[in-house]
UniProtKB/Swiss-Prot annotation:
Keyword Magnesium assigned: no
Family, as annotated: Belongs to the transaldolase family. Type 3B subfamily.
Organism listed in the record: Trichlorobacter lovleyi (strain ATCC BAA-1151 / DSM 17278 / SZ) (Geobacter lovleyi)
This protein's UniProt keywords: Cytoplasm, Pentose shunt, Schiff base, Transferase
Recorded catalytic activity of this chain's protein: D-sedoheptulose 7-phosphate + D-glyceraldehyde 3-phosphate = D-erythrose 4-phosphate + beta-D-fructose 6-phosphate
Entry protein name: Probable transaldolase
Family annotation (NCBIfam families): fsa_talC_mipB
Amino acid sequence: MKFFIDTADVHEIREAHTLGLVDGVTTNPSLIAKSGRKFKDVIKEITAIVDGPISAEVIALDAEGMVKEAKDLVKIHKNIVIKLPMTPEGLKATKQLSAKGIKTNVTLIFTPMQALLAAKAGATYVSPFVGRLDDISQDGMGIIEEIRTIFDNYGYTSEIIVASIRNPIHVLNSALIGADICTIPYSVMLQLSKHPLTDAGIKKFLEDWEKVPK
């Protein structure tokens, strides 16, 4: 399984990269806004840190505008992936960009059928949002399992990026289901490495070491 980091915070990306955990990065307008920096400046800096797919989202709502923005964004770096909304216009843009060899990530997916449409349009990646579904008492991980089954049934090559991850259990279940990628907030990445028994074991080893004659 690949791990992407879901942030536009360059410091977090650097820290996660030093751990050897980052295979790619996903950003969105909300994350860019939090950084307080210019969009292209942030994307350029990220591409200098991580040698992997970097998802940059378009703002236009019409297919023509999306394609125009995409052509501008891919000039930044070869690793740029165009993030498009799951709408009819987004599907049109996905089809056009895929035909030109431009990688796409269809986002804001909340049903298996939306993922299927994105795959049929030629999306490189599909991004179902599990946390937001959980928030409204729907089964977020359930749709990941359904998407995996549909893609396997028909041989779709679009990779499943599990997004809106809130906790380590989301990552665990994604791995068990066979999702291709999890895009994970930095805080959750750090949680993956933690367990109270690990901390207790380290403490015990250090205490015992102090008893060893020096």
